């Protein structure tokens, strides 16, 4: 009897081990395949963006040169990869001198047409009209399209890739409550905390202030505008209704008091002080992923738009 029970237990363990091995193999295979596809899209976007930048530079140099002023470089164009300041205009507060050094400014063209699609996103949007933008954090794997669907299925891309195939990784996505084009006062983007370091896994590095000091900027483009955000708070909270901070439910503040309370809560929960406090009228971005030190935890990186 004991021997028979032992055999049964061994068989159960073998089956459980085999099932786990199959799951992990499928998990990492799917992740690797999806990451390769995302890398191809990122490379395509980068190439088209670079070609656009070069064409704009060429057009600028081919036009009639303006009269040179004392101390000015007559070949210099007015091209500004950062666009215009945010509502509060705190460039001195939001940017450090090092971040404003030319070698630290990425070649990211700005086309704020308000209606025309940025040309480097046109092809991808034609492939999947659910694409609403592009998210990038430099020196990380975060370089992905951002998706959005209707209210009847707001989490559609939680476990679907860009091509709408089932995927453990899913896509980076915004729920329908957020309007990225208006934009809403706060836009929350969701992504998985993948074991292979892809999707939003990198966000966990912001638990350490040194990561924020070295890499505080987030680049989030809509289909029509390019924008830069700077992280002002990093925190964790419970995702259970009625327990944690419901940051994801705030899209448009009813008034200045509600906006300020939202910012204050983000900063109260923050692991460290960044010295940045957004003001009413600024536009915010929250990146949300799973956090495993608390039950149903969420790890959130909150940023304010600076261009």
Please tell me what each predicted stretch does.
Residues 20-307:
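Solvent-exposed, non-transmembrane regions of membrane-associated and secreted proteins
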Residues 1-16:
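N-terminal Sec-pathway targeting helices
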